[in-house]
């Protein structure tokens, strides 16, 4: 059937003037099976409208929805040595990086930016799980440290959206070194008395959980996010016991006091803005109520009614 698909069908389409339908126009909700039009899903921040299931969202899309009017200024990530260990598994590490960079159009998995949320200036840092599983390496470590340095220099709070499978094995000890480096950067932010809020997204595991993802002043998680150090399968094989249902889910961690709150992505901006105002002792934003009708307007409406 390949000759029909590869030759006959395109020929017929070209004669009849039919256009090829792009893939992924409709995206399936994995919980309900509902098919959602991709533009509707993007407008809803990749949250399924009926089930509330939180799908993965790119770093750029997250920042567009997070900052006021979708306006932000990206911070340039520092340059680092590529593939210092000349690592190779099934594929050369440097080739793997080239593939991801070509596919996603970014150098690594960290995107940091400055902007405002409800008028408050902040620095936001987002890990993109699509780039090598959000793994923590030299490039991402340097980018995170720069974001903290920028927040301190500009006297802004920092909000970090974590999404990672852990340390990047292709960089060995150089990857693990980013854990204490980011920890020091956090301490410097706290010494400057600036807030640090962490949003834990699905998944947040490994060395990221063991470092900057769990050192915030406030920890917020998205619904249904998996958060932990080792994965549940590894733990179960190690201790040879059945784990509780929903173990490592954001709701389970909230119930057991590991995080402060679980917040929908649709309410994240408002929630974080409110928290930052409390932490920085800024006045609350008061939404003006609609003006009440004047006496003359009231009497006029009564006259018309009569």
From Swiss-Prot:
GO biological process: fatty acid biosynthetic process; malonyl-CoA biosynthetic process
The protein's annotated pathway: Lipid metabolism; malonyl-CoA biosynthesis; malonyl-CoA from acetyl-CoA: step 1/1
Primary residence: cytoplasm
Pfam family, one: Carboxyl_trans
Superkingdom per UniProt: Bacteria
Location of the CoA carboxyltransferase N-terminal domain: 25-294
GO cellular component, one term: acetate CoA-transferase complex
Signal peptide: none
GO molecular function: acetyl-CoA carboxylase activity; ATP binding; carboxyl- or carbamoyltransferase activity
Recorded catalytic activity of this chain's protein: N(6)-carboxybiotinyl-L-lysyl-[protein] + acetyl-CoA = N(6)-biotinyl-L-lysyl-[protein] + malonyl-CoA
Region (Disordered): 284-306
InterPro entries: AcCoA_carboxyl_beta, Acetyl_CoA_COase_Trfase_b_su, ClpP/crotonase-like_dom_sf, COA_CT_N
Keywords: ATP-binding, Cytoplasm, Fatty acid biosynthesis, Fatty acid metabolism, Lipid biosynthesis, Lipid metabolism, Nucleotide-binding, Transferase
EC number: 2.1.3.15
EC primary class: transferase
Location of the protein in the cell: Cytoplasm
Subunit structure as annotated in this protein's UniProt entry: Acetyl-CoA carboxylase is a heterohexamer composed of biotin carboxyl carrier protein (AccB), biotin carboxylase (AccC) and two subunits each of ACCase subunit alpha (AccA) and ACCase subunit beta (AccD).
Entry function: Component of the acetyl coenzyme A carboxylase (ACC) complex. Biotin carboxylase (BC) catalyzes the carboxylation of biotin on its carrier protein (BCCP) and then the CO(2) group is transferred by the transcarboxylase to acetyl-CoA to form malonyl-CoA.
Family assignment from sequence similarity: Belongs to the AccD/PCCB family.
Name of this chain's protein: Acetyl-coenzyme A carboxylase carboxyl transferase subunit beta
Organism: Bartonella tribocorum (strain CIP 105476 / IBS 506)
Primary gene name: accD
